[in-house]
Curated annotation (Swiss-Prot):
Keywords assigned by UniProt, alphabetized: Cell projection, Cytoplasm, Cytoskeleton
Record-given protein name: Uncharacterized protein C11orf97 homolog
Polar residues compositional bias, start-end: 102-115
InterPro entries membership: C11orf97-like (IPR040429)
Subcellular location: Cytoplasm, Cytoskeleton, Cilium basal body
Keyword Protein transport carried by entry: no
Cellular component GO terms held in the UniProt record: ciliary basal body; ciliary base; cytoplasm
Signal peptide from the UniProt entry: none
PANTHER family according to UniProt: CHROMOSOME 11 OPEN READING FRAME 97 (PTHR38326:SF1)
Residue segments, region Disordered: 1-26, 100-124
Domain of life: Eukaryota
S-S pairs: none
Length: 124
């Protein structure tokens, strides 16, 4: 940190602004910087005032809504169930509907030419 400037942060009010000879401003956070002796601007030790103003109420509401939407998108209640939902399914992986209880053939239990791909489902 350089010794040229020292920052002082205080809670500003309209009365502080009027004491400095400036027009009254709404309450906010005021930062003042002063040049210390020995610096390049040693002769003039003035205070520079910077006023922080909060964003408009509607802008804050919109930002809070966007933040809550992002939180909801990132929050998954059961991540393992969601992850396995697209990968493993009994309907996709096992031929349940093709088996009829009355008909049993010797070739029925042999593997078919179909195979499962997680990118495209069942293929021949």
């Amino acid at each position: 940190m350089r010794r040229q400037e020292a920052l002082v942060v205080t809670a500003g009010t309209a009365s502080e602004a009027s004491r400095d000879g400036e027009q009254p401003r709404p309450a906010g956070l005021v930062c003042r910087a002063r040049v210390e002796p020995g610096g390049p601007q040693e002769s003039r030790q003035q205070w520079k005032t910077f006023l922080y103003c909060e964003p408009h109420k509607r802008i804050k509401e919109v930002l809070e809504e966007e933040l809550s939407i992002k939180r909801d998108e990132c929050h998954v209640k059961s991540p393992t169930a969601v992850a396995l939902d697209g990968i493993w399914s009994i309907r996709r992986n096992l031929p349940v509907g093709g088996m009829i209880p009355g008909q049993q053939s010797r070739n029925c239990s042999l593997p078919q030419t179909k195979y499962y791909s997680r990118h495209g489902g069942l293929r021949r």
